[in-house]
UniProtKB/Swiss-Prot annotation:
It is an enzyme of class 3 (hydrolase). Keywords: Cytoplasm, Exonuclease, Hydrolase, Nuclease. The keyword Nuclease applies. Transmembrane segments: none annotated. It is found in: Cytoplasm. Residues 8-171 form the Exonuclease domain. This is Oligoribonuclease. InterPro entries: Exonuclease_RNaseT/DNA_pol3, Oligoribonuclease, RNaseH-like_sf, RNaseH_sf. GO terms for molecular function: 3'-5'-RNA exonuclease activity; nucleic acid binding. The gene is orn. Its main location: cytoplasm. Belongs to the oligoribonuclease family. The active site is at residue 129. One of its GO terms (biological process) is DNA metabolic process.
Amino acid sequence: MAADANNLIWIDLEMTGLEPDVDRVIEIATLVTDQELNIIGQGPVIAIHQSDEVLAAMDDWNQKHHGESGLIERVRASQVNEAEAVAQTIAFLAQYVPKGVSPMCGNSVGQDRRFLNRYMRELEDYFHYRNLDVSTVKELVKRWSPETMAGFKKQNTHQALQDIQESIAELQYYRSKVFKI
């Protein structure tokens, strides 16, 4: 498949916390859709190795959720560091989307961008500076059409691939219920 500038890159990171100055990325997943939000490619889903010290520093919420999902054990067992995760992800993305054209797509991608900027700059640079943040649409729908909110329920698995799939489904839902384009 030739890279297409109209394709969209969807990303989700799982982190040890919310502060890039002290927390680290522990999982990354990407999907590519066409402009109609049809999934056309799934990138590698990568648990990124972090030290036991980094994992032990996670707060209770992260320990609970990443422990229950099995992510902590996957991170401990992983041999992939951040640089290798970046290389694998860019190799996948380059098949579908030229560098610098796709906005960063997902939920609360501003937070993901902060971590990419800190730890995975080459991957952050692969994106356009714009974001396609489903969270923004959700906030608008909540205020302007609250009855529409009841029609979409997220599973909140806090697993990167499932979270991206839900983000795409959520935007598809809002597109069908709210946007008259």
